[in-house]
Amino acid sequence: MARSRSRIDRTPFQTEILDLSHDGRGVARREGEGGKVTFVSGALPGEVVMAEQTARSRHFDEARTVEVLQASPQRVTPKCPHFGTCAGCVLQHLDEDQQIVAKQRVLMDNLERIGHVKPGKVLAPLVGESWGYRRKGRFSVRRVEKKDKTLVGFREQDPRFVADLSQCLTVIPEIGTKVEALSTFIESLDGKRDIPQIEFIAGDQAVVLTVRHLQPLSDADRAAWAAFGQQHGFVIYLQSGGVDTVQPLDGQGVPLSFRLAPWDVELAFRPLDFIQVNAKLNEKMIAHALDLLEPGEDERVLDLFCGLGNFTLPLARRVREVVGVEGDAGLVARARENAVRNGLANAQFFSADLTQDQRSTPWMRQGFDKLLLDPPRSGAIEVLQQLPLKQFKRIVYVSCHPGSLARDAGYLVNEQGFTLVSAGAMDMFPHTAHVESIAVFEKR
């Protein structure tokens, strides 16, 4: 729903916060407004705050906290100086132990409200390090004439603006401590107005910055980027258009990979490939998913939305055969190369758009014992409706959006005769409202 700013009353008002929304904002019902819901950024349940309206719509309003009059015992001082402006982290004011409690509650609420299901068991949440964990991301870049400087950072809570960051504490230190240096450097370039974004990604061997540029770089700027990369330990790639235009600045680049030591697996990838952003929690998640799947050494497992083989190749160490299916043909090519690299001949990979009809494809007609899937935010309903689901003794569903998981869980339980054995949250993105989760289904 479109938000209106034309009728905003910026007079601060006092309100009590009743709950925490799925996106990390406090939920209030304003007296004198007919109990209309207001989402208040920077506020926690149980608090009384002074707030200022920032947006209005027919069904709800939005506001930001101006002053906390009565603080929650769960409130802590945010570690980052940019909290409240940058939208990268919205939960830093909530005690870390309570952040995952809130995410667990969001998951269970979605399962019940959207899917009309309840897990037989609530899994203990999966947690890891909460600072310096993010190894992949995208910084927006914008030259702001009024400030006479170039801003580098994530979007502000008002997404029209780029946050003016000096550092980022959730990004790995190799990058997070150098945001200000990156901003100062870009300001010195001839083409400082022609760089809209920079993607970063780190493997075990190197940290890569991929610089999106709208105009060809001058010779001076190319030399400057080379010197900046050498000074700060970055490998620089350039992107003039789509993904196919990404090229190393020096013409050679660097091999990128990360090891999954518990399974003696190494996954190679390219600078714009999808990898899980939190390396240590990724290992915990793989171990957790495999334990929940209970793979047998003589079983065949189907792994949907498999990417580079993040789950597929560790699974190949445990089962007779595993088949991975992924929509991105480039990732499938890398997954096949990774299988060869790791000597795993029992892993097959297929490229397929899993939102389209796949019932005539060879992999769909193969028989499997178990299913693991890790779909995007939109979920997996299209492919679930095509699969011969009764063949799967157990399904493990890894989700990055509790709403789509809940919808798909409702389909599996209420229409296909599965039981939701267990479900729980995983804190892949500490200090954000992002809810990663895992659920286990069995045939009734």
Curated annotation (Swiss-Prot):
Database matches in SUPFAM superfamilies: Nucleic acid-binding proteins (SSF50249), S-adenosyl-L-methionine-dependent methyltransferases (SSF53335)
Reaction catalysed by this enzyme: uridine(1939) in 23S rRNA + S-adenosyl-L-methionine = 5-methyluridine(1939) in 23S rRNA + S-adenosyl-L-homocysteine + H(+)
Keyword line: 4Fe-4S, Iron, Iron-sulfur, Metal-binding, Methyltransferase, rRNA processing, S-adenosyl-L-methionine, Transferase
One example of a Gene Ontology biological process annotation: rRNA base methylation
Active-site feature positions: 400
Binding site for S-adenosyl-L-methionine: 276, 305, 310, 326, 353, 374
UniProt-listed InterPro entries: 23S_rRNA_MeTrfase_RlmD, MeTrfase_TrmA_AS, MeTrfase_TrmA_CS, NA-bd_OB-fold, SAM-dependent_MTases_sf, TRAM_dom, U5_MeTrfase_fam
Binding site for [4Fe-4S] cluster: 80, 86, 89, 168
Tagged with keyword Lipid metabolism: no
Record-level Gene Ontology MF annotations: 4 iron, 4 sulfur cluster binding; iron ion binding; RNA binding; rRNA (uridine-C5-)-methyltransferase activity
Residue ranges occupied by any TRAM domain in the UniProt entry: 5-67
EC number: 2.1.1.190
Function: Catalyzes the formation of 5-methyl-uridine at position 1939 (m5U1939) in 23S rRNA.
HAMAP family the UniProt entry points to: 23SrRNA_methyltr_RlmD
Family: Belongs to the class I-like SAM-binding methyltransferase superfamily. RNA M5U methyltransferase family. RlmD subfamily.
Designated name of the protein: 23S rRNA (uracil(1939)-C(5))-methyltransferase RlmD
Native species: Stenotrophomonas maltophilia (strain K279a)
Lineage: Bacteria, Pseudomonadati, Pseudomonadota, Gammaproteobacteria, Lysobacterales
Gene assigned in the entry: rlmD
